[in-house]
Amino acid sequence: SEGRLRCAHVLGIMGDGAGYDTLADTVANTAAFDSENIDSYFPCVTWLDSYIIALGRTRDRRATPIILEKLAALSSDEGGGYSSHCRAVCEALEQLGDPAAAQPLAQLLERCGGAADVVTELKSVNGSSRGRNGVRNLIIARVLYRCGDWENRGRAALSAYASDLRGVYARHAKAVLERQPGEATRPEGWLGL
């Protein structure tokens, strides 16, 4: 029911797994990503994105295969809406920290260009340097590293971003690399994006 889903959603966002079954069923049985942005409730996400995030925040690793199905549906050329879907899947997988997600994340990172958007020379700065791809790929690399890395692909991308001229990217990558692969990249109980 709608009420049960709303309660499970709120509990999941708060890190409570009591509504896991309802969230898992909803995410698993939603065939495609939606496009309605729910800005007034949660910034720059759709309802499915928010359910995926809530499912990950339950920290119940039974959710991993369900979320990996959504990851498989992502395409690097999907366009503007892709960013929120990718961020939601990554947020959920980061909360779970399941090594089973490492290889699919490495494949997603490769499909999205890996560290191709790293800016190491001023002459390479252009309008696309300010796009979402660099942030998206940095997030994918961080989550891949959090899930234990796969063939050191997360470390390689993060190492490249550690040399990025955009200071916030470099500092972020360096902070992640201070930890070991598989080690939580955020404090216990963290609920932010």
Where does each model-flagged region fall?
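Glycine-/small-residue-rich active-site loops that bind phosphorylated ligands and cofactors
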Residues: L165
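Amphipathic alpha-helical scaffolding segments comprising HEAT/armadillo-like alpha-solenoid repeats
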Residues: S1, D16-N37, D60-S75, D98-V125, ...
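Structural detector for internal amphipathic alpha-helices that build alpha-solenoid repeat scaffolds
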Residues: E2-G17, D25, E36-D60, D77-D98, ...
